[in-house]
Amino acid sequence: MSEGSVIFKGSLNGLTIIMKEEEDYDSILKQIEDKIASSGRFFKGAILSVKYRGKKLTEEQERKLFELLRDKSGAKIKSLEEDTEEPVKPEPVQQQPRFRSKIRMSNFYFKGLEEGITKFHRGTVRSGQLVSFDGNLVIIGDVNPGGEVCATGHVIVMGSLRGMVHAGANGNREALVVALNLQPTQLRIADVITRPPDEKETVGQFFPELAYIKDGMVYIERYLPAR
């Protein structure tokens, strides 16, 4: 079995499985199963349309792959089909000044991250509710005290975050937590756990804030883009 013969690439509500053409089919199935198992509970609740490319599959092989995804991932698999579209080749771009002073912090925060599946959850996460995902998680709403959100990638809350949050749940210390009002009862990135001070300074207007790891500690900063 060749390691790295299977790659998952995804976007919102979609997953593409890239398989090495020369790899044995049974080995590919085993690698896919291992990838799903290592993701734990984070596939659960997702609704995915799946495509594959790189290796031609018979109808029987395609059926077995569909059953594996359906039975092992915990996600709802809407469809499975071969990706017949040719990958888009990026056009060459001339090197030009990039105004690094304005994007320096953004480059720092996102260094080393790979694009992955992003799940959008619309609505308030209430007390006792858990929303989790293997990838980036965007909450369009609030996270109330007693609510919990967990993701292997970034966690972004388009509202008040007053519950528990865990980003980088698979050990990714490059993950971020971002919220319009960041007041979690517990904040965790990878294996680093913290909580905000009991008396957090508040003003009449909320500002987006982000949390990240630097030198083994969690830092929380206001996000004020340069004008």
Swiss-Prot record:
Pfam families attached to this UniProt entry: MinC_C (PF03775), MinC_N_1 (PF22642)
InterPro entries: CAP/MinC_C, MinC, MinC_C_sf, MinC_N_1, Septum_form_inhib_MinC_C
Gene from which this protein is expressed: minC
Domain of life assignment: Bacteria
NCBIfam families assigned to the protein according to its UniProt record, in alphabetical order: minC
Subunit annotation: Interacts with MinD and FtsZ.
Protein name in the entry: Probable septum site-determining protein MinC
Physiological role: Cell division inhibitor that blocks the formation of polar Z ring septums. Rapidly oscillates between the poles of the cell to destabilize FtsZ filaments that have formed before they mature into polar Z rings. Prevents FtsZ polymerization.
